[in-house]
């Protein structure tokens, strides 16, 4: 019991189960960034990406980072620190995703620079852009205990038109009474799959 309780408490902290902050709704990857739906972008279309490259993140990415931060603060006020599994909290740190995806993209596109939107990409002289979207299906403590991560990368040409979409997917089924959810491993696997497709389709 002494091992199980901290794990369950930390899991609630990380995933906002029960009465924690509600999960942010998943929105279209282009919402408030581009005046069309992302649904029509061809999947796996080969292209040569112009340099230098802009990196833009979707509302889903920003919502994910904000949600984990808010959940951590919320449960930190309720759960005694002695019952908190700090390893799980570290495993779900949203800055890990940001660092890993940026590191991977920089290997392929050294000129990559973060911008807030396409207007800034054009005004700063970027000749191509990558928009990163993140979709997460969180485990259900009493249902499907599988965490699923999808990372979508949309590639835009010099005119800032979307030309190709690539996806990296990974999932992990969390065992009952687990002391960790292996979220960073799941992110790493999704990024690795995405990188393999970048190698195959993007020049």
List each language-model region with its residue ranges:
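Surface-exposed short loop/turn segments
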Residues: 28-31, 111-163, 174
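Soluble periplasmic/extracytoplasmic beta-strand elements of cell-envelope proteins
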Residues: 48-59, 129-133, 150-154, 165, ...
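A structural motif corresponding to the C-terminal end of an alpha-helix
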Residues: 97-115
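Extended alpha-helical regions
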Residues: 1, 113-127, 192-203
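C-terminal/domain-edge helix-coil "capping" segments
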Residues: 18-45, 107-109, 159-203
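A structural "domain/chain start" motif
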Residues: 18-99, 201-203
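Sec-dependent bacterial lipoprotein signal peptides
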Residues: 1-18
């Amino acid at each position: 019991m002494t091992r199980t309780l901290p794990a369950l408490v930390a899991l609630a902290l990380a995933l906002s189960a029960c009465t924690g902050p509600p999960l942010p709704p998943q929105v279209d990857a282009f919402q408030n960034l581009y005046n069309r739906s992302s649904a029509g972008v061809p999947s796996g279309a080969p292209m040569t990406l112009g340099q230098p490259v802009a990196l833009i993140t979707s509302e889903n990415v920003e919502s994910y980072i904000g949600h984990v931060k808010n959940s951590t603060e919320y449960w930190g006020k309720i759960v005694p620190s002695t019952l908190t599994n700090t390893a799980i909290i570290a495993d779900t740190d949203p800055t890990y995703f940001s660092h890993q995806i940026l590191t991977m993209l920089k290997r392929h596109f050294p000129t990559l620079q973060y911008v807030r939107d396409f207007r800034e990409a054009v005004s700063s002289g970027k000749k191509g852009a990558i928009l990163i979207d993140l979709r997460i299906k969180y485990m259900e403590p009493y249902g499907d205990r599988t965490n699923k991560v999808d990372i979508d990368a949309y590639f835009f040409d010099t005119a800032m038109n979307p030309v190709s979409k690539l996806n990296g997917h990974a999932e992990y089924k969390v065992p009952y009474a687990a002391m960790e959810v292996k979220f960073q491993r799941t992110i790493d696997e999704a990024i690795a799959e995405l990188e393999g497709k970048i190698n195959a389709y993007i020049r």
